[in-house]
């Protein structure tokens, strides 16, 4: 019997006498070596979903089409991947319009869900949280830091109920003056962290987005965790639920390009003890914890044609190592244990 996908990967490791290792799902353009970050339109079209070992080896492509696929996240049981795609976008719609899709971890059965972006799974793997326009299934906000956008809410949805009965999502944030995006579900399932800023706050390519948490059922008032004159992005809960990792904008835009300088920061779940983990004056974005909470993977802008690559650091900011290399741009990683299934 031929094994596919993650099952084959686990089998190969066991055969080699090794314990199963961690797996990273990520976005890459390595299949098109002619791309650079300056070619924004083609870059947005060419990005595909890949899977690799946690050490950066054995990368393989899961999606293959002439459109953009991005922001992947593995389900807690490792069997499914939720991701963005603009394959359903019409010519009349903005180029960054995206829908949510779900597929098997091996890349099979790619199925459209609803319009939205940047989904995260609930700990039990039944629900997803994502952001979309306040009208429900309208234009999602841009995922480029500093880009102008319309209002956006955080929505939740039962994936299997939607597939079986078309039971739609409902929004748990409802502020028409704000853009709420980048949700991440807490390990205990009770709260969702997200980023929020005012719709009008798009001047000088410099948002003052902050990190908030809200009850996962939408009750109560969202609680603000950060309060800075800078931009905070992409919150990610630590596996024990004690801390939240995020990208924190510090300083002027990076010389030679439109990407602002983002570092990595961490804060306690109650908003106390904000700590800066990196200080590199470059764009470091979309950080996520390893499943054991000991390491962090993120993508960084580097010089040359492979303008974004994945890096790993220890949870205290030490021990940096580069995980991916040109050709191709690599980023938007999500880490998961292969032997969790």
Model-inferred region functions:
Residues 3-21:
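Bacterial Sec-dependent signal peptides at the C-terminal "C-region" and cleavage site
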Residues 16-341:
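Sequence signature of WD/YWTD-type beta-propeller architectures
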């Amino acid at each position: 019997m031929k094994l596919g996908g993650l099952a084959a990967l686990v089998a190969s490791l066991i055969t080699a006498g090794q314990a199963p290792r961690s797996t990273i799902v990520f976005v890459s353009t390595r299949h098109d070596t002619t791309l650079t970050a300056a070619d924004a339109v083609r870059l947005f079209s060419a990005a595909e979903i890949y899977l690799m070992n946690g050490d950066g080896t054995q990368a393989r492509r899961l999606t293959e089409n002439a459109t953009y696929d991005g922001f992947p996240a593995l389900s807690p049981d490792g069997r499914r991947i939720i991701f963005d795609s603009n394959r359903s976008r019409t010519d009349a719609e903005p180029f960054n319009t995206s829908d949510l899709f779900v597929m098997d971890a091996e890349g099979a059965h790619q199925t459209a869900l609803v319009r939205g972006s940047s989904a995260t799974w609930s700990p039990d793997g039944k629900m997803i949280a994502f952001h979309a326009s306040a009208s429900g299934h309208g234009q999602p906000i841009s995922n480029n830091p500093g880009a102008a956008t319309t209002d956006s809410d955080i929505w939740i949805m039962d994936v299997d109920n939607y597939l079986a009965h078309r039971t739609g999502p409902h929004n748990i944030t409802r502020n028409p003056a704000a853009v709420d995006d980048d949700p991440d579900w807490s390990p205990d399932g009770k709260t969702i962290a997200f980023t929020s800023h005012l719709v009008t706050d798009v001047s000088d390519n410099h948002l003052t987005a902050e990190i908030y948490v809200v009850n996962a059922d939408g009750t109560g008032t969202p609680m603000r965790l950060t309060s800075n004159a800078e931009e905070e992005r992409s919150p990610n809960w630590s596996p024990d639920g004690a801390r939240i990792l995020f990208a924190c904008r510090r300083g002027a835009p990076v010389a030679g390009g439109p990407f602002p300088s983002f570092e990595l920061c961490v804060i306690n779940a109650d908003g106390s003890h904000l700590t800066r983990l990196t200080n590199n004056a470059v764009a470091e974005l979309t950080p996520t914890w390893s499943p054991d909470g000991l390491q962090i993977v993120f993508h960084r802008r580097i010089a040359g044609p492979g303008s974004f690559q994945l890096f790993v650091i220890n949870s205290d900011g030490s021990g940096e190592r580069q995980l991916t290399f040109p050709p191709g741009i690599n980023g938007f990683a999500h880490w998961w244990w292969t032997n969790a299934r």
